[in-house]
Structures are given as structure tokens and as C-alpha cells.
Curated annotation (Swiss-Prot):
Interacts with ERF1-2. Its main location: plastid. CXXCXXXG motif repeats lie at residues 239-246, 283-290. Keywords: Chloroplast, Membrane, Nucleus, Plastid, Repeat, Transit peptide, Transmembrane, Transmembrane helix. Expressed in young leaves, curds and flower buds. One of its GO terms (cellular component) is chloroplast membrane. Residues 206-297 are annotated as: CR-type-like. CXXCXGXG motif repeats lie at residues 228-235, 272-279. It comes from Brassica oleracea var. botrytis (Cauliflower). PANTHER family: PLASTID TRANSCRIPTIONALLY ACTIVE PROTEIN, PROTEIN ORANGE, CHLOROPLASTIC. Involved in chromoplast differentiation. Is associated with a cellular process that triggers the differentiation of pro-plastids or other non-colored plastids into chromoplasts for carotenoid accumulation. Associated with carotenoid accumulation in de-etiolated cotyledons. Controls leaf petiole elongation by suppressing the expression of ERF1 genes. GO terms for biological process: chromoplast organization; positive regulation of carotenoid biosynthetic process; unidimensional cell growth. This is Protein ORANGE, chloroplastic. Residues 1-54 form a transit peptide.
Length: 305
């Protein structure tokens, strides 16, 4: 429709002197050549505009607008699918490059202001602990988590095995009635030596704590396996040019001592041009993401690999 509208827009206006004169004007060979040349130029312009519009459509088209709206893939044509895959594949690396530059500028600003915060570099998710008053579970405090869980389990076992039966006998709770109940059912008398309330409480608490501990430790270990092996999840490597200092010491000869064999050199400090004074450079394996795999061939992006 856009091509037809452009062709109609370059047609001559109606001749007020009659249709015969206008037909004779159009029938001349010069007019035909000029119109043919205009039509071909318009076709080329329209094709370029269509390609530009398709690129803009591929760049601005969003399949998933948000968590509430998901569009159907079946309605898309093959060319649309290819254009959207290409545009999104390019956007992945553009966003990674933007994140890398933003982090470098953030580190430079923190260095200029004297702010040193190493926790910002470790942005992997933390898991909240199920035990109250404990910090979120990470690989750093995993030993504290082990010690707390084992001490809690040991306390429950001691309470259920020693303290609770002693308190029941002193307070007169259970004991004889439970023994009579076992004897009336003609069950082994060894069962009367175990309090069912204490046994169920201790066994259930220990089982629940152990199961939750195993699940959360497995989550932390899975996150460790997903980290990049080179940068250990930080996304950065130490700059080899400045030895992670962010500055270079350059010595320049100034003058020679009388005799001509020795020269006096002065040193000056300047910011490292390789890392821009940050002391760290981008990890080429994870592209500053800290994850083990960050490319278009990631199984999370391409499910057919």
C-alpha cells in the first residue's frame, strides 16, 4: 500500500484542458521514460524503507512484554522469527557490554570517593536460612551453618533422651500409665522404656532439620557449580599490566651526569589505560556475568543444543 500511495503521489494532476491532451502528454516517449525512471526509483526507495521498517520492527518487537502478557509464537512467520532471534542475540551482548562499562565506571567512582565495597562484586543470590536469627546462606558462612545445625540437633537429642524422661518421672507425667498400657496390649515391655511423645518430637525435629539442611546445602553447591571457573563468580580478573593497582609508574631520563655514562631518571604515576584505573578487567569467559556460560549457545537460550 505504501508503494501504491507513492506511485499515485507522483502522477500528474488532472489537466484542466481535457483528457485528450493529458493522454497525449503521457503517450510521449520522454514522459514514459521519466515516469519509468521515477517508478524504479520509488520501488528502490520503498524496498529500503520496508527493510528499515522490518529492522525497526525486529528491534522494537517484544514477545514477552511482562510477567502477565505472553504472546503466541505460532502466529509469527519464518522471517519474523529469524529477525527477532537475530536482534535479541545482538542485544544480549550489547547489554553485557553496557553492564561491563557501568561496573567499571562504578568502581572508578568508588575509588575516587574512597569507597571500598567488595560485596558488590558478588551478586549471586543468597538463600535465607530457615533457622531464625541466622544470616542468609552463602558459601562463605556454610561452616557456621553446619555448626549451628549440628549443635541444634545435638541439643534436641539430649533433651529428648535425658532431660525429658527425667522431668517426666519427677513430675509424675506418663511413666506408669504408659507402662500399663503396653502391658495391657501384651506388647514387649521394652517399648515402655521409650516415651512416645519425646521420641516423636525428637525424631520429627531432627528429621526436618536434617532434610532442610541437605536441601539448602545442595542449593549453595549448585550455585557454586554455576560460577565461572576463572573469575570465581566475580566477573573480573586482575589487570596484568598494572598488577591490579590501577596505576602505572613510568620512569623517564631527565639529564646526564658529567661524564656522559649515567643519567638521572624521574618517575611519575599515571592511571592504567588497560583497566582505566579500576585494577580489574573483564573476564573473557563469562563476559562480566560471573556465570559459567554466557553466550548465545547457552542451553537456557537455545533448548536444542
Amino acid at each position: 500500500m505504501s508503494c501504491l500511495g507513492r506511485i499515485l503521489s507522483v502522477s500528474y494532476p488532472p489537466d484542466p484542458y481535457g483528457s485528450r491532451l493529458s493522454v497525449s502528454k503521457l503517450s510521449s516517449p520522454g514522459r514514459n521514460r521519466r515516469l519509468r525512471w521515477r517508478f524504479t526509483a520509488l520501488d528502490s526507495d520503498s524496498s529500503s524503507l520496508d527493510s528499515d521498517s522490518s529492522d525497526k520492527f525486529a528491534a522494537g518487537f517484544c514477545i514477552i512484554e511482562g510477567p502477565e502478557t505472553v504472546q503466541d509464537f505460532a502466529k509469527m512467520q519464518l522471517q519474523e522469527i529469524q529477525d527477532n532471534i537475530r536482534s535479541r542475540r545482538n542485544k544480549i551482548f550489547l547489554h553485557m557490554e553496557e553492564v561491563r562499562r557501568l561496573r567499571i565506571q562504578q568502581r572508578i567512582r568508588n575509588t575516587e570517593l574512597g569507597i571500598i565495597d567488595e560485596e558488590q562484586e558478588h551478586e549471586l543470590p543468597n538463600f535465607p536460612s530457615f533457622i531464625p536469627f541466622l544470616p542468609p546462606l552463602t558459601a562463605a558462612n556454610l561452616r557456621v551453618y553446619y555448626a549451628t545445625c549440628f549443635s541444634l540437633i545435638a541439643g534436641i537429642i539430649l533433651f529428648g533422651g535425658l532431660l525429658a524422661p527425667t522431668l517426666e518421672l519427677k513430675l509424675g507425667i506418663g511413666g506408669t500409665s504408659y507402662k500399663d498400657f503396653i502391658q495391657s496390649l501384651h506388647l514387649p515391655m521394652q517399648l515402655s522404656q521409650v516415651d512416645p511423645i519425646v521420641a516423636s518430637f525428637s525424631g520429627g525435629a531432627v528429621g526436618v532439620i536434617s532434610a532442610l539442611m541437605v536441601v539448602e546445602v545442595n542449593n549453595v553447591k549448585q550455585q557454586e557449580h554455576k560460577r565461572c571457573k576463572y573469575c570465581l563468580g566475580t566477573g573480573y580478573l586482575a589487570c596484568a599490566r598494572c598488577s591490579s593497582t590501577g596505576s602505572l609508574i613510568i620512569s623517564e631520563p631527565v639529564s646526564a651526569i658529567a661524564g656522559g655514562n649515567h643519567s638521572v631518571s624521574t618517575s611519575k604515576t599515571e592511571r592504567c589505560s588497560n583497566c582505566s584505573g579500576a585494577g580489574k578487567v573483564m573476564c573473557p569467559t563469562c563476559l562480566c556475568t560471573g556465570m559459567a556460560m554466557a553466550s548465545e549457545h547457552d542451553p537456557r537460550i537455545d533448548p536444542f543444543l
